[in-house]
């Protein structure tokens, strides 16, 4: 087994710890992400039902409603999100899910774009809401292709700054090669938050 800070003594690879470290490095190097406070972002992984390249690779779930409100109207009913808290009791504002092994089987560049795609959804106010664009498609703006071109630009700028090479090395591995080198892939598994009626 190769030495890696994300491998435990029992030779399992802590994927969610690794993902957090990649995001930490991105935020430190890209000023557009400086508003993100990772201590209030939870990372989780979900087992992909099928080993295919198609389908969801990652999602970002906001834990509050528009404008950072603690509740909102859904189908005529006022609801709030069942809260998720950090170990020190602070409210988690965002939940980042990665789908394994589908995410791991992307190319290194695709992994970077996927991670940045989800981080860019975080509101500039870091208030638990999504970044909202004008128009009907407020999540991805009027052009999702332009959104992803911007993420590719961010990924290229991050790589140009010569980040931690071990992070890049792991990102270049697919799921089979990752397990062969470091062992079984594990990590935090957090259920999607429930919407519950207010009061």
Model regions and ranges:
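Short pre-active-site segment immediately N-terminal to the catalytic Zn-binding motif
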Residues: 97-114
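Short, well-structured alpha-helical patches and their helix-loop capping segments
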Residues: 107-111, 118, 139, 143, ...
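"Short basic amphipathic alpha-helical interaction patches in structured regions
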Residues: 110-116, 130-134
């Amino acid at each position: 087994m190769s030495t890696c800070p994300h491998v435990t003594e029992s030779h399992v690879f802590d994927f969610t710890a690794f993902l957090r470290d990649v995001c930490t490095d991105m935020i430190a190097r890209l000023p557009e992400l400086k508003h993100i406070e990772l201590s209030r972002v939870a990372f989780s992984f979900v087992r992909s039902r099928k080993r295919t390249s198609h389908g969801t690779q990652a999602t970002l779930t906001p834990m509050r409603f528009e404008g950072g409100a603690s509740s909102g109207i859904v189908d005529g009913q006022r609801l709030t999100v069942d809260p998720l808290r950090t170990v020190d009791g602070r409210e988690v504002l965002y939940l980042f899910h990665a789908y394994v092994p589908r995410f791991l089987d992307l190319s290194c560049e695709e992994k970077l774009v996927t991670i940045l795609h989800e981080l860019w959804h975080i509101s500039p106010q870091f208030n638990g809401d999504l970044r909202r664009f004008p128009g009907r498609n407020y999540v991805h703006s009027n052009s999702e292709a332009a959104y992803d071109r911007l993420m590719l630009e961010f990924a290229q700028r991050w790589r140009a700054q010569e980040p931690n090479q071990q992070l890049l090395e792991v990102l270049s591995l697919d799921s089979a090669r990752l397990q062969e080198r470091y062992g079984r892939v594990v990590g935090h598994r957090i259920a999607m938050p429930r919407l519950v009626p207010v009061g």
